[in-house]
From Swiss-Prot:
Membrane-protein topology: Multi-pass membrane protein
Spans traversing the lipid bilayer: 4-24, 61-81, 86-106
Keywords: Electron transport, Membrane, Mitochondrion, NAD, Respiratory chain, Translocase, Transmembrane, Transmembrane helix, Transport, Ubiquinone
Naturally occurring in which organism (per UniProt): Prototheca wickerhamii
Gene Ontology cellular-component annotations: mitochondrial membrane; NADH dehydrogenase complex
UniProt name for this protein: NADH-ubiquinone oxidoreductase chain 3
Gene Ontology molecular functions: NADH dehydrogenase (ubiquinone) activity
Lineage per the UniProt record: Eukaryota, Viridiplantae, Chlorophyta, core chlorophytes, Trebouxiophyceae
């Protein structure tokens, strides 16, 4: 039990410091925002439209697809570096992973998630 005491103390100090840093702005900051600070800024001109307008759902779909395939690359790099050590099981596991992602990509493509019309 005593060998984990340092980790426990570190955890509680990190938790206390995190809570302090999260709560400190609520105690120190001003309560009322200036209208100039919350207005949109467009190169020194008055804004033409509301800056907090709605985006098309297509942008969110592309962002989600980007995150999915970005994670694929994040998994592929370590796999490629350790391919000679993990053997056939690691190879076929990654091939299954890539196959599932490819099937998902084809599904998204056929459903029209990538069409901008």
């Amino acid at each position: 039990m005593y060998e984990f005491l340092g980790i426990l103390i570190y955890f509680f100090i990190a938790l206390a410091l995190s809570l302090l840093l999260l709560g400190l702005p609520f105690l120190v900051s001003t309560r009322k925002a200036d209208p100039e600070k919350i207005s949109a800024y467009e190169c020194g001109f008055d804004p033409f439209d509301d800056a907090r307008g709605r985006f098309d759902i297509q942008f969110y779909l592309v962002a989600i697809l980007f995150i999915i395939f970005d994670l694929e690359v994040a998994f592929l790099f370590p796999w490629a570096l350790t391919l000679n050590k993990i053997g056939y099981f690691g190879f076929w596991s990654m091939m299954l992973f890539l196959f599932i992602l490819t099937v998902g990509f084809i599904y998204e493509w056929r459903k029209g998630a990538l069409d901008w019309s």
